[in-house]
């Protein structure tokens, strides 16, 4: 599998000069990272020249707080579980506040991505029995915009709508870019890391009005039940090795 991945990455490097290519071993997963300006042209070439006739999935990613944890010790502690529900980390804040990039335990983000928002597409070539992950970062995190791929793979239509709905990523050229999972009057994008876990509004039935009403959240305390933990131990040796291989491949 390693030889097959190496041969494939050589072809990608020859065709897409300047792009970053990473290989995760031993599974042989290949990731092609391109600039947002080259997103559409690269995907078109992958379909027409390299035989990736199917896009099986597309999603958005929010890297806010990436690399930060909320529980950075493996030793027995007298502080107890309270450390998991105190402090200002990503997800632990109320509406109108901005999450801290630092954990309550003092851990710092590591290997931060270039930009906050990314779009990731999973491609399949049946004729070459090959899979490929393609990623690009939106250059503007205030209004993240990348080109739509609906004219290349029509089936990506609803995937892009989902990424727009949940992350607020705008797909330029999409024929019908509107929400697909949340209400049309929904405020914000719920998969963004700065979206409060308590939400913006809560729903209840009003006896006087005889209908459902939306009101600002007042009955929910902003807290995280399970803290984010990043551990380096034997269970993650393979993953750590893959990261090393990927960095070498770049």
Curated annotation (Swiss-Prot):
GO molecular function term, any single one: NADH:ubiquinone reductase (non-electrogenic) activity
EC class name: translocase
Keyword check for Cell membrane: yes
PANTHER family: NADH DEHYDROGENASE [UBIQUINONE] IRON-SULFUR PROTEIN 3, MITOCHONDRIAL, NADH DEHYDROGENASE UBIQUINONE IRON-SULFUR PROTEIN 3
Pfam families: Complex1_30kDa (PF00329)
Function: NDH-1 shuttles electrons from NADH, via FMN and iron-sulfur (Fe-S) centers, to quinones in the respiratory chain. The immediate electron acceptor for the enzyme in this species is believed to be ubiquinone. Couples the redox reaction to proton translocation (for every two electrons transferred, four hydrogen ions are translocated across the cytoplasmic membrane), and thus conserves the redox energy in a proton gradient.
Membrane topology designation: Peripheral membrane protein
Entry protein name: NADH-quinone oxidoreductase subunit C
GO cellular component, one term: plasma membrane
Compartments, record wording: Cell inner membrane
Species this chain originates from: Xanthomonas euvesicatoria pv. vesicatoria (strain 85-10) (Xanthomonas campestris pv. vesicatoria)
Subunit structure: NDH-1 is composed of 14 different subunits. Subunits NuoB, C, D, E, F, and G constitute the peripheral sector of the complex.
Keywords tagged on the record: Cell inner membrane, Cell membrane, Membrane, NAD, Quinone, Translocase, Transport, Ubiquinone
Entry's EC annotation: 7.1.1.-
Superkingdom: Bacteria
Reactions this protein catalyses: a quinone + NADH + 5 H(+)(in) = a quinol + NAD(+) + 4 H(+)(out)
């Amino acid at each position: 599998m390693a030889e097959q991945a190496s041969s494939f990455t050589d072809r990608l490097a020859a065709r897409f000069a300047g792009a970053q290519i990473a290989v995760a071993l031993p599974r042989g997963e290949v990731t092609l990272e391109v600039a947002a300006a080259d997103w559409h042209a690269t995907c078109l070439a992958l379909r027409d020249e390299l035989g990736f006739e199917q896009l099986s999935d597309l999603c958005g990613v929010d890297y806010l707080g990436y690399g930060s944890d909320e529980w950075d010790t493996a030793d027995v502690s007298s502080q107890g579980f309270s450390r998991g529900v105190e402090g200002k980390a990503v997800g632990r804040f109320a509406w109108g506040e901005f999450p801290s990039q630092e954990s309550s335990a003092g851990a710092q983000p590591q290997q931060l991505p270039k930009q906050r928002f990314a779009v990731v597409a999973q491609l399949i070539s049946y004729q070459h029995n090959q899979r490929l992950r393609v990623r690009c970062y939106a250059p503007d995190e205030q209004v993240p915009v990348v080109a739509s791929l609906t004219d290349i793979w029509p089936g990506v239509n609803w995937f892009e709508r989902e990424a727009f709905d949940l992350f607020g990523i705008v797909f330029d050229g999409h024929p019908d870019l509107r929400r697909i999972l949340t209400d049309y009057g929904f405020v914000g994008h719920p998969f963004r890391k700065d979206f409060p876990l308590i939400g913006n509004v809560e729903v209840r039935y009003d006896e006087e009005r005889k209908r459902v009403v939306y009101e600002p959240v007042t009955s929910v305390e902003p807290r995280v039940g399970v803290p984010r933990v990043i551990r380096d131990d034997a269970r993650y040796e393979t993953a750590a090795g893959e990261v090393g291989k990927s960095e070498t491949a770049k």
